[in-house]
């Protein structure tokens, strides 16, 4: 269930993402009904999430704390020291919350740096009962703003776990982006590096949000991927900027995106628009962080590389493509 706390779709998406799993905690129901509807800025979200995260950590509720630390970091720029502090706290409390599980962290060598990866081993009982032909490994890919912790926690909702689950922060994602490795279009390369590291010869792959595009790109060029789930599927990354716009403005936005020149005009226009929209402001901030580029016109040109048009017809694996009627992206 999606709750409209504030009326701001971007804010409500992040608040639902964090608070839905912890609504049963003492006092959270009051916060959900009395405090969240009054939220009007990213600064308020950061302060509220930090206070709650620190409170729950002191109370020993690491499962609530890691989710709130992630939200506290969400809207902060990469140059804000609080972001790194909150992400470190998220990882620390996530590990505490999942202590005792067959879940391990890994650093996968890649292009002179490292990809953060996590592996959750299959449940032996589920594995023994799995039908013949069940994949032995599931690789899960996050998207535009996720971390390995969040995406692998998603697997806790699976009714059974007859396969190893591997997730990783690729270039431009989560911990890997924070370490300075920018987003790259050839997603098969980091995927192959992760499969090599774990000695995986075949795997199913699932992508969430922008990961729904990345998993398709990886499948098109990585034959070790045998089955694909896109949850949901994004044909091109730039749709994330244009789809939320009023329908009448989308053709204009598409025209600007396809030819982001003159650059100074585009930079000035998007800079002005972002001051009027918290959603656009955050998207541009996050895009700069992931790509390592500074100007909006540069970001638009770089995002143009993330489209399925270039590899149409190359995906031959069985695919399950999911989409929601009210999806934002």
Where on the chain are the PLM-derived regions?
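N-terminal cap/lid segment of alpha/beta-hydrolase-fold proteins
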Residues: 42, 49, 80, 84-130
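Short beta-strand element of the alpha/beta-hydrolase
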Residues: 129-143
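Alpha/beta-hydrolase active-site loop
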Residues: 150, 157, 179-200, 204-205, ...
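Conserved alpha/beta-hydrolase
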Residues: 158-175
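Short glycine-enriched nucleophile-adjacent loop
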Residues: 205-207, 212-223, 228-235
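Flexible "cap/lid" loop of the alpha/beta hydrolase fold
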Residues: 229-256
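Active-site nucleophile elbow and catalytic-triad environment of alpha/beta-hydrolase enzymes
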Residues: 293-311, 317
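Short beta-strand/loop motif that positions the catalytic acidic residue
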Residues: 315-316, 321-323, 327
């Amino acid at each position: 269930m999606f709750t409209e706390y504030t009326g701001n779709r971007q804010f409500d998406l992040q608040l639902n993402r964090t608070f839905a799993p912890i609504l049963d905690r003492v006092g959270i129901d009051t916060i959900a009904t009395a405090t969240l509807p009054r939220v009007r800025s990213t600064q308020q979200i950061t302060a509220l999430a930090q206070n709650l995260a620190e409170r729950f950590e002191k109370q020993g509720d690491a499962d609530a704390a890691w989710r709130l630390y992630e939200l506290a970091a969400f809207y902060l720029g990469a140059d804000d020291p609080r972001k790194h502090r909150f992400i470190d706290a998220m990882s620390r409390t996530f590990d505490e919350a999942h202590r005792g599980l067959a879940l391990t962290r890994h650093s996968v060598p890649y292009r002179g740096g490292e990809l953060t990866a996590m592996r959750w081993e299959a449940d032996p009982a589920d594995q023994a009962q799995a039908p013949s032909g069940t994949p032995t490994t599931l690789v899960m890919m996050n998207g535009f703003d996720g971390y390995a912790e969040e995406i692998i926690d998603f697997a806790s909702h699976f009714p059974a776990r007859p396969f190893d689950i591997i997730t990783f922060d690729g270039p431009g994602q989560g911990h890997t982006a924070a370490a300075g490795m920018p987003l790259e279009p050839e997603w098969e390369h980091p995927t192959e590096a992760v499969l090599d590291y774990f000695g995986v010869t075949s795997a199913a792959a699932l992508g969430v949000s922008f990961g729904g595009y990345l998993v398709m790109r990886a499948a098109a060029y990585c034959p070790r991927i045998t089955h694909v789930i896109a949850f949901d599927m994004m044909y091109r990354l730039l749709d994330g900027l244009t789809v939320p716009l009023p329908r009448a403005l989308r053709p204009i936005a598409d025209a600007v995106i396809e030819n982001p020149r003159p650059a100074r005009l585009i930079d000035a226009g998007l800079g002005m628009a972002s001051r009027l929209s918290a959603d656009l402001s955050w998207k541009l901030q996050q895009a700069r962080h992931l790509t390592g580029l500074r100007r909006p016109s540069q970001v638009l040109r770089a995002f143009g590389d993330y489209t399925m048009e270039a590899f149409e017809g190359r995906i031959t694996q069985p695919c399950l493509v999911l989409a929601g009627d009210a999806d934002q992206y």
